[in-house]
Swiss-Prot record:
Annotated compartments: Secreted
Reported modifications of this chain: Maturation of lantibiotics involves the enzymatic conversion of Thr, and Ser into dehydrated AA and the formation of thioether bonds with cysteine. This is followed by membrane translocation and cleavage of the modified precursor.
InterPro entries (UniProt xref): Lantibiotic_typ-A_Bacillales (IPR006079)
Propeptide: 1-24
Protein name (database record): Lantibiotic nisin-U
Source organism per UniProt: Streptococcus uberis
Length: 55
């Protein structure tokens, strides 16, 4: 198996100048309504649960 079997959106990074390295998260805040990572980011419960009800 080689890397051409799957498209995983991988990029090559050079150790000399870190070319090709860039953040993939473009949101200013991960604590937005509907954010699936809200609980992991310790957001307020109302935001972290995305309006879902448990019970």
């Amino acid at each position: 198996m080689n890397n051409e079997d799957f498209n995983l959106d991988l990029i090559k990074i050079s150790k000399e100048n870190n070319s090709g390295a860039s953040p993939r998260i473009t949101s200013k805040s991960l604590c937005t309504p509907g954010c699936k990572t809200g609980i992991l980011m310790t957001c307020p419960l109302k935001t972290a649960t995305c309006g879902c009800h448990f019970g």
